[in-house]
């Protein structure tokens, strides 16, 4: 990670 701002976007 690095900056957890689009966690759901990454898990899509």
UniProtKB/Swiss-Prot annotation:
<comment type="subunit">
    <text>Composed of two subunits, alpha and beta. The complex is formed of four rings. The two outer rings are each composed of seven alpha subunits. The two inner rings are each composed of seven beta subunits.</text>
</comment>
<comment type="function">
    <text>The proteasome is a multicatalytic proteinase complex which is characterized by its ability to cleave peptides with Arg, Phe, Tyr, Leu, and Glu adjacent to the leaving group at neutral or slightly basic pH.</text>
</comment>
<comment type="similarity">
    <text>Belongs to the peptidase T1A family.</text>
</comment>
<dbReference type="GO" id="GO:0005737">
    <property type="term" value="C:cytoplasm"/>
</dbReference>
<keyword id="KW-0963">Cytoplasm</keyword>
<dbReference type="GO" id="GO:0019773">
    <property type="term" value="C:proteasome core complex, alpha-subunit complex"/>
</dbReference>
<keyword id="KW-0647">Proteasome</keyword>
<protein>
    <recommendedName>
        <fullName>Proteasome subunit alpha</fullName>
    </recommendedName>
</protein>
């Amino acid at each position: 990670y690095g900056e957890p701002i689009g966690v759901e976007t990454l898990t899509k």
